Swiss-Prot record:
Binding site for Mo-molybdopterin: 93, 96-97, 151, 234, 239, 250-252
Lineage, broadest ranks: Bacteria, Thermotogati, Deinococcota, Deinococci, Deinococcales
Signal peptide: 1-57
Name the record gives this protein: Protein-methionine-sulfoxide reductase catalytic subunit MsrP
Modification(s) after translation: Predicted to be exported by the Tat system. The position of the signal peptide cleavage has not been experimentally proven.
EC numbers: 1.8.5.-
Source organism, top-level taxon: Bacteria
Naturally occurring in which organism (per UniProt): Deinococcus radiodurans (strain ATCC 13939 / DSM 20539 / JCM 16871 / CCUG 27074 / LMG 4051 / NBRC 15346 / NCIMB 9279 / VKM B-1422 / R1)
Gene3D superfamilies in the record: Oxidoreductase, molybdopterin-binding domain (3.90.420.10)
Region (Disordered) location: 1-29, 49-77
One of the GO biological process terms: protein repair
Functional note: Part of the MsrPQ system that repairs oxidized cell envelope proteins containing methionine sulfoxide residues (Met-O), using respiratory chain electrons. Thus protects these proteins from oxidative-stress damage caused by reactive species of oxygen and chlorine. MsrPQ is essential for the maintenance of envelope integrity under bleach stress, rescuing a wide series of structurally unrelated cell envelope proteins from methionine oxidation. The catalytic subunit MsrP is non-stereospecific, being able to reduce both (R-) and (S-) diastereoisomers of methionine sulfoxide.
Cofactor(s) listed in the protein's UniProt record: Mo-molybdopterin
C-alpha cells in the first residue's frame, strides 16, 4: 500500500446526484442574520464528560421559532434520520477560539465579529480573489445538506446545513495543474477571541484537504444552519463541512483558502502528531490511542450506537482512498517534522475524555 500522506495526484471523486438548491429567500435570512450575530447569539453549553449535557448559561432559542424551514434534499445529501435539536446543535460545541468548554462558544459568541468579513483564495489558482463574505455567497445557489457529524470524542449529531459546494468555488477560480491540496486558515484575533489569549494551540487554526477531497460533491462550505444564518458558535460566517471525516476537519470562521502543491501542516497534527493525522476519516476499526472509536453517543439519545465507516458515506467516498493505508501511521509519523509546540498536558488534565478537537489517524 502507498503512503496516504504522499503528494501524488489522487483520482477524481465519484459524482453523486445533483442536490436541490434552497429557495432564494435564504439570502434575505443571511442578510438579516448578519446584523444580529454580534448580539443575539449568547447561548450556553462546557468541556465536561461527553455523555453529560450541560445546562446553557442562558436560555437557548425555541427551535420552533429560532430555526427556519429546512428543505429535505435527496440522495446522499440527507441521512433520512431525525435531526439533532437546535438547542443541542448551538449549545454543545467545540470551537476553541471561543473557549475550551462545550458551552464557551455559545457564551462568547458575541466576541466573534462576522461582519465585515473578507475571504481570500490564493496559491495555485488561476484567478485568485479577495472578496467579502456576502459577495462570495451571492455567487452560488445555496443548498440544504443534512449530514451526520462525528466527533473523535465519541459523540455525534445530525445537522441540517445550508451553503454551497466547495467544488463550485474552486472550479470558478480554476486550480492550476500543480494544485494538489487546499489549506484553510481561520480567524486570528486574540484581542477579541477569549480562547486565543491563553497558549493552548498555535493560532490561527489551520486545516487541509487533498484537492480531490475538496472537489467531492459532499464537501460543503456552510453559511447557515437549520434554515437560518450560521450561529457564531457553529463557525460563522463560513465553515467547512466534510461529513465523512472527524469533526476537527470542519474548520470554522474561514478567512483564507490556499491551494498548494504539497500537503499543508494542520493544527492538530502539529499539536499531537501521535494522535491526529491529516486524513481523519471516520473509522470505527481504528481506535484513538486513548479510547475506542467503535461506538458513539448521538446527542439527544440515550445509549450508544455503532459508528459507521466513513460516517456512513463510504459508498460515495471510499474510492478516494483505494490502495491507501489510511489506518497506518508509521510512515506518517516518520515523515512528520518535529512539533513546533504541542498542547501542554496541563491544558487537558482533569477532563474526560482528554482535551481534544476531533480526528484520529
Amino acid at each position: 500500500m502507498t503512503d496516504p500522506d504522499s503528494t501524488s495526484p489522487a483520482p477524481d471523486p465519484q459524482q453523486p446526484a445533483d442536490p436541490q438548491p434552497t429557495d432564494p429567500g435564504r439570502r434575505e435570512v443571511l442578510r438579516q442574520g448578519a446584523l444580529l450575530t454580534a448580539t443575539a447569539l449568547g447561548l450556553g453549553g462546557g468541556l465536561t464528560l461527553l455523555t453529560r449535557r450541560p445546562a446553557p448559561a442562558e436560555p437557548a432559542p425555541d427551535p420552533q421559532t429560532a430555526a427556519g424551514r429546512v428543505i429535505r434534499p435527496t440522495g446522499p445529501y440527507d441521512t433520512q434520520e431525525a435531526m439533532t435539536g437546535y438547542r443541542d446543535m448551538t449549545t454543545y460545541n467545540n470551537f476553541y477560539e471561543l473557549g475550551l468548554g462545550k458551552d464557551d462558544p455559545a457564551r462568547h459568541a458575541g466576541a466573534l465579529p462576522t461582519r465585515p468579513w473578507t475571504v481570500v483564495v490564493d496559491g495555485e489558482v488561476k484567478k485568485p480573489v479577495t472578496l467579502d463574505i456576502d459577495t462570495l455567497q451571492s455567487w452560488f445557489p445555496l443548498e440544504d445538506r443534512i449530514y451526520r457529524m462525528r466527533c473523535v470524542e465519541g459523540w455525534s449529531m445530525v445537522m441540517p446545513w445550508f451553503g454551497f459546494p466547495l467544488a463550485a468555488l474552486l472550479r470558478r477560480l480554476e486550480p492550476t495543474g500543480a494544485a494538489r491540496y487546499v489549506q484553510f486558515t481561520a480567524i486570528n484575533a486574540p484581542d477579541k477571541l477569549p480562547g486565543q489569549r491563553p497558549w493552548v494551540l498555535e493560532w490561527p487554526y489551520t486545516e487541509g484537504l487533498r484537492l480531490d477531497e475538496a472537489l467531492h460533491p459532499l464537501t460543503l462550505l456552510a453559511v447557515g444552519l437549520e434554515g437560518r444564518s450560521l450561529p457564531a458558535q457553529n463557525g460563522a460566517p463560513l465553515r467547512l463541512v466534510v461529513p465523512w471525516k472527524y469533526g476537527f476537519k470542519g474548520i470554522k470562521a474561514i478567512v483564507r483558502m490556499t491551494l498548494t502543491r504539497t500537503q499543508p501542516q494542520t493544527t492538530w497534527a502539529l499539536a499531537a502528531p501521535d494522535e491526529y493525522g491529516f486524513y481523519a476519516n471516520v473509522n470505527p476499526a481504528v481506535p484513538h490511542p486513548r479510547w475506542s472509536q467503535a461506538t458513539e453517543q448521538r446527542i439527544g439519545e440515550s445509549g450508544r450506537r455503532p459508528t459507521l465507516p466513513f460516517n456512513g458515506y463510504g459508498e460515495q467516498v471510499a474510492g478516494l482512498y483505494s490502495g491507501l493505508d489510511c489506518g497506518g501511521t508509521s510512515k506518517w509519523r516518520a515523515a512528520r517534522p518535529p512539533m513546533r509546540g504541542s498542547v501542554q498536558a496541563s491544558c487537558w488534565a482533569g477532563y474526560s475524555p482528554p482535551f481534544s478537537c476531533c480526528g484520529t489517524r
